[in-house]
Regions:
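Fe-S-dependent hydro-lyases/dehydratases of central metabolism
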Residues: 1-747
Length: 747
């Protein structure tokens, strides 16, 4: 189905051809570089310094973004900035705090000149597709699934501080990325949907890092054969491959989509130029695709549904082993209990949001369920359309009525099932979902309370087939159904014109920001000291640590407008002792600053053979060790929560994503790495001493000799800060992005 070629490729006469040599200049002929160059402010340093046509955030990120930008000197939004309300839109946790955030968001749109999309009108990425996309554009979003490549728009998802930089008229700085050609051939068989293709792609490239921090460029004869919703459904899942961004060839289907959405002038035909050079190629033969499943706990745990249905026991036992390895005795997952007479019984089906909720997916699900029902047992099916305009189409064409008659439930335009804020399964429940992720606990369970559930990612088509079989896992390839007849798509913009606040270009500086009692300013962040003494607050030896583990989503997201309250939940579902340990380190630092030397600190000084006078040059903070932290969400709070608890660094072998590393840097946490194969023997409570860290960082050193104090004994280790730009070093020296810009404003 999928072939990887880890060698250079050029397009010659529209045909991929092995490149005889590396030809970086040929990247300028790719669609990606044609767009990137137009958005670059070159500084002669070989990096790209990008500006964006528009920005977008949702209601669990925009408060922090605006608070940071305000503290950094922002007076108005210089580019279109859209604030959507699709994550905490249930307003079901914490009393008034969620709606308080929404009120704050509207007041910020009025004051600074932004656009505000009220709750339940649209999920963030569907609104961007319908209203903001256009060929050759670039959009930066504070959500990792900011992907609009199928519409000719390069989307990048980053943490909130990168949005802040754009609001302050600065740039998004990256090394010039490699580009991977994704060559599509064939036509997918009936019953195979975009999520099947996406899961297979994730399975092929995630674990080997084949596309990490690269741009995926989709081309080939099959592109023109795919409907727009199909392309969009594949594209949004490219985030799960760890790539930087994506772009697709554009054609008449894209032109029609943009025209239907009232923006025909934003269409431009995009194609690679002859001689375009790619750093590798992925060939996908769609005709050989099968319905797929991504087992817990990652979209890359790909297996064909055919295999899973034929031999469920072995696959489920592997999942149980992964759960046992991660959660130990805190919570158990016993999915083999779901086997009844050799068949796998699932408890719940969800079709939702920016990946699953598109019109075509829901219409196909309705066709599969037509004349059937979901049963009256434990299994339930819920459908979340991505926007009110799409929901109106589903109603007008009878799709919604058909699904309701079959026993499915329609719910608001809401991202909840994707991050644990809606339709949380029962303990030991098994949910099949056409959503973006199935990380541990992302469905909402709490291992610290003995809860655990599992999510298998599947396409809407096979979810509907399973619903038709009353919860018995079923592939859409194994059911007979008549696909829905093509319909003339339409878009009713009046929905938005009547409800959305369009404020760009109409800032009202005298208008007040409206604060609820939970919305708090960022606490003071210290600058980097001459020497650094770090106490290990958590050691995470899992292969990968996700941002969902670093700061859980779900109901805790309601507290993201209050940095100190939110920090209480840091690592709560992975290492509940992290917060108490980090706070204990803060007490040590407070004692040092007051001139006291507690016994624990005196013991560390003896191990390091340092006099008490060395404390005057030192800062004491906490540090997390993880093998590979930062997969998943763009949420800056994965880093900021550590920072407000006194965190000053991460130590790892590599960062899972560029965006998490950027979040650490923007919050002033040193992104230390270890050499491949180097041991880190530290345990929670141990110390790491980095002498001269400020001086070395200021002069651009990459190697930082350090000392690990483990069980009272000092042992040398070497930490690295590689590929750190001059601006990143300045942010780290000043303590965080806010401090950096505040200092600039004072000058």
């Amino acid at each position: 189905m999928i072939k990887l070629q880890n060698k250079g490729v050029t397009l010659q006469g529209g045909v991929p051809t092995p490149a005889e040599a590396v030809f970086p200049a040929g990247r300028d002929k790719t669609m990606a570089y044609q767009i990137l160059r137009r958005h670059d402010r070159p500084c002669g340093d070989g990096s790209m310094h990008l500006t964006f046509d528009s920005l977008i955030s949702h209601d669990i990120t925009y408060v922090g973004v605006i608070q940071t930008a305000k503290a950094s000197g922002m007076t108005e939004f210089p580019v279109p900035y859209v604030l959507t309300n699709c994550h905490n839109s249930l307003c079901a946790v914490g009393g008034t705090i969620n709606e308080d955030d929404h009120v704050f968001g509207l007041s910020a749109a009025v004051k600074y000149g932004g656009d505000y999309v009220p709750a339940n009108q649209a999920v963030i990425h569907q609104y961007a597709r319908e209203i903001m996309s256009g060929c050759g554009r670039m959009i930066l979003g504070s959500d990792s699934h900011t992907r609009y490549g199928a519409l000719g728009t390069m989307g990048i998802g980053e943490g909130g501080p990168e949005i802040v930089k754009q609001l302050l008229r600065n740039t998004y700085d990256i090394a010039a990325p490699e580009v991977i050609l994704v060559w599509l051939t064939g036509q997918p068989p009936q019953g195979v949907g975009p999520h099947d293709v996406a899961i297979a792609l994730c399975g092929a490239v995630y674990k080997n890092g084949f596309v990490k921090n690269k741009v995926l460029e989709f081309a080939g004869p099959a592109v023109s054969q795919l409907p727009m919703d199909y392309r969009i459904g594949i594209d949004v899942m490219t985030t799960e491959t760890a790539c930087l961004s994506s772009i697709w060839e554009t054609d008449d289907a894209v032109a029609e989509y943009l025209a239907i959405h009232g923006r025909p002038e934003t269409f431009t035909a995009l194609h690679p130029q002859d001689g375009a050079y790619y750093d590798g190629m992925i060939t996908i033969d769609l005709s050989r695709m099968e319905p797929m499943a991504a087992l817990p706990f990652h979209p890359s745990e790909a297996v064909t549904l055919r295999e899973l249905i034929h031999d469920p026991g072995d696959h489920l036992r592997e999942v149980e082993k992964r759960a046992e390895a991660q959660f130990g005795g805190k919570a158990g997952l016993h999915l083999t209990d779901k086997l009844v007479n050799g068949k796998l019984m699932v408890d719940q089906g969800i079709i939702a949001g920016c990946a699953g909720g598109m019109y075509d997916n829901i219409a196909e699900a309705a066709a599969i369920l037509n004349g059937h029902d979901t049963g009256s047992g434990y299994f339930s099916l819920s459908v979340y359309p991505p926007s009110v305009p799409v929901n109106l189409e589903l109603m007008e064409n009878g799709v919604q009525q058909s699904l309701l008659a079959s026993g499915a439930l329609f719910k608001p335009c809401f991202c909840g099932p994707c991050f644990g804020a809606g339709d949380v399964p029962a303990n030991n429940g098994l949910s099949i979902r056409h959503t973006t992720r199935n990380f541990p606990n992302r469905e909402g369970s709490k291992p610290s309370d003995g809860q655990l559930a599992g999510v298998i990612l599947m396409d809407a088509r096979s979810i509907a087939a399973t619903a038709r079989n009353h919860g018995v896992l079923t592939s859409a390839a194994d059911v007979d159904y008549t696909p829905p007849a093509p319909v003339q798509r339409r878009f009713d913009r009046n929905v938005y014109d009547r409800r959305v606040y369009f404020g760009f270009g109409h800032a009202r500086p005298d208008a007040p920001l409206k604060y609820g009692p939970n919305i708090a300013e960022w606490p003071a962040i210290p600058a980097l000291a001459d020497d650094l003494l770090m106490q290990v607050a958590s050691v995470l030896r899992d292969e990968v640590t996700t941002t969902d583990e670093l700061i859980p989503s779900g109901e805790t997201s309601s507290y993201r407008s209050n940095p100190l309250k939110l920090a209480e939940f840091a690592l709560s579902r992975r290492d509940p002792d992290y917060v108490p340990r980090a706070k204990a380190t803060q007490v040590l630092e407070a004692s040092r600053a007051a001139g006291a030397v507690p016994p624990a600190l005196a013991e560390v000084l003896r191990s390091l053979d340092l006099p008490e006078s060395a404390l005057a040059r030192m800062h004491i903070g906490s540090v997390i060790f993880a093998n590979k932290p930062g997969d998943g969400s763009a949420r800056e709070q994965a880093a900021s929560c550590q920072r407000v608890l006194g965190g000053c660094a991460n130590i790892c072998y590599e960062f899972a994503t560029k965006r998490y590393r950027s979040n650490c840097v923007n919050w002033g946490m040193l992104p230390f790495t270890l050499a491949e194969g180097a041991a880190f023997d530290g345990d929670a409570g141990d110390f790491v001493y980095v002498p001269g860290v400020r001086e070395k960082l200021a002069r651009g050193d990459e190697e930082f000799p350090a000392v690990l104090v483990h069980k009272g004994k000092a042992q040398p280790i070497t930490l690295y800060l590689k590929n750190t730009s001059a601006e990143e070093r300045e942010l780290l020296l000043t303590g965080c992005l806010m401090n950096h810009y505040a200092a600039q404003n004072r000058r």
